[in-house]
């Protein structure tokens, strides 16, 4: 059984997904793993964990899963609760990509990965996107690094959508202003400030310009 939504409704092509096997067959939610997941799944070996995932994902590509295990240099017999943070992220990436689900959600897939591993993930994600009709939704805090690979950005805070926009359009009107706090405040007066940091007399802010505004 799934956890019911506390508010609203989730649909796939107009079909409610709650306990709906047909709708769920098109969706994969690859969540962030940890060593103490609260169930017995974290005691499984990698190969057994992936086998369990296969049982719930009808379009599973075992050949791809096996290939990704080798590419990430994971040990199939190693247990989930013995993996590092980066290795746990690799497992979630494998589940997401090998699921072959039409609509795939990845929760913080690059957490704990080094730069090389993150670049490998972005390459694999783009390759899969270009070769299929799949849609990927990726939650991440490393926005600058991932900006070039996403078509659309959605910023969510405390369950509310603050912004939903084409990536390039958003980049074209986004600016980071830094310098002496008084000068930064003067330059950004009247503008929408979305983030600000101040250390001593130095300040940096991120602003989004509306139509007709300049800085």
Feature map (PLM): residue ranges:
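Conserved catalytic motifs of ABC-family nucleotide-binding domains
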Residues: 100
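Catalytic Walker B motif of ABC-type/P-loop ATPase nucleotide-binding domains
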Residues: 104-108, 113
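ABC transporter nucleotide-binding domain
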Residues: 122-137, 141-208
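Helix N-cap at the start of a conserved alpha-helix in ABC-type nucleotide-binding domains
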Residues: 115-117
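ABC-family P-loop ATPase nucleotide-binding domains
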Residues: 22-25, 31-91
């Amino acid at each position: 059984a799934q956890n019911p939504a506390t508010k609203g409704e989730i649909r796939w092509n107009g079909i409610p997904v709650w306990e709906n096997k047909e709708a769920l067959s098109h969706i994969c939610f690859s969540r962030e793993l940890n060593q103490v997941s609260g169930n017995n799944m974290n005691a499984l070996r990698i190969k057994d964990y992936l086998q369990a995932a296969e049982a719930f994902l009808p379009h599973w590509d075992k050949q791809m899963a096996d290939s990704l295990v080798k590419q990430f240099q994971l040990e199939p017999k190693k247990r989930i609760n013995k993996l590092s943070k980066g290795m746990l992220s690799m497992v979630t990436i494998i589940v997401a990509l090998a699921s072959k689900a039409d609509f795939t959600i990845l929760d913080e897939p690059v957490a704990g990965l080094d730069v090389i591993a993150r670049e490998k993930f972005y390459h694999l994600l783009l390759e899969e996107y270009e070769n299929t009709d799949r849609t990927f939704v990726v939650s991440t805090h490393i926005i600058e690094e991932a900006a070039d690979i996403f078509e659309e950005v959605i910023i969510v805070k405390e369950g509310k959508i603050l912004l939903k926009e084409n990536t390039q359009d958003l980049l074209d009107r986004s600016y980071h202003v830094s310098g002496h706090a008084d000068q930064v405040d003067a330059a950004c007066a009247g503008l929408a400030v979305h983030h600000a940091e101040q250390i001593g007399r130095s300040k940096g802010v991120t602003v989004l310009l509306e139509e007709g505004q300049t800085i």
